[in-house]
C-alpha cells in the first residue's frame, strides 16, 4: 500500500532537483550545501518510511486478527493455556448468571442426572449467548413431574 506518500516524495525530489539547477553559474556551489541537501533528502525519506511502516504494521495486525478469527471458526481456536484461564471465570459467571435468572432451584436425586446432562452437555448451557434458554430449560425441568415426585 503505497498511497499518497510515494507521489509526494517524487514531487519533493523533483522540486529540490529543480531548485538546485536553477542557480546555475550565478553562484558558486559549495560541497557543504550539497551535503546538507542530501542529508535533508535522506531524513525525509526515512521519515516517510517510518510513517509507511507504521501504517503497514497496523494493516498487518488487522489482517492477523481476521486470520485468527477464521482459524477459531475452523476449530483451531486459541492455545490451551488461554482456555485454562478463561474457563474457570466463565463457569463462575455462568453459575451466577443462571442463579440470577432462575432463582434458587431444587433438583431431586432422581432428577440430578437430567440436570447434569442439561447443565454440562447442551449448547444452551455451554454457550454464553444461550444462557437465557438454559435458564428457561432448567426452570422447566425443576417443575416437571419427574422432578416433582420426591418433593411431595
Curated annotation (Swiss-Prot):
GO terms for biological process: cell surface receptor protein tyrosine kinase signaling pathway; positive regulation of ERK1 and ERK2 cascade; positive regulation of ERK5 cascade; positive regulation of neuron projection development. It comes from Homo sapiens. Its main location: secreted. This is ALK and LTK ligand 2. Changing residue 97 to E: Slightly reduced affinity for receptor tyrosine kinase LTK. Changing residue 100 to E: Slightly reduced affinity for receptor tyrosine kinase LTK. It is found in: Secreted; Cell membrane. PANTHER family: ALK AND LTK LIGAND 2 (PTHR28676:SF2), ALK AND LTK LIGAND 2-RELATED (PTHR28676). Cytokine that acts as a physiological ligand for receptor tyrosine kinases LTK and ALK, leading to their activation. Cytokine-binding is sufficient to activate LTK. In contrast, ALKAL2-driven activation of ALK is coupled with heparin-binding to ALK. Stimulation of ALK signaling is involved in neural development and regulation of energy expenditure. One of its GO terms (molecular function) is receptor signaling protein tyrosine kinase activator activity. Widely expressed with highest levels in adrenal gland and modest levels in pancreas, testis and uterus. Belongs to the ALKAL family. Changing residue 136 to E: Reduced affinity for receptor tyrosine kinases ALK and LTK. Keywords: Cell membrane, Cytokine, Disulfide bond, Membrane, Secreted, Signal.
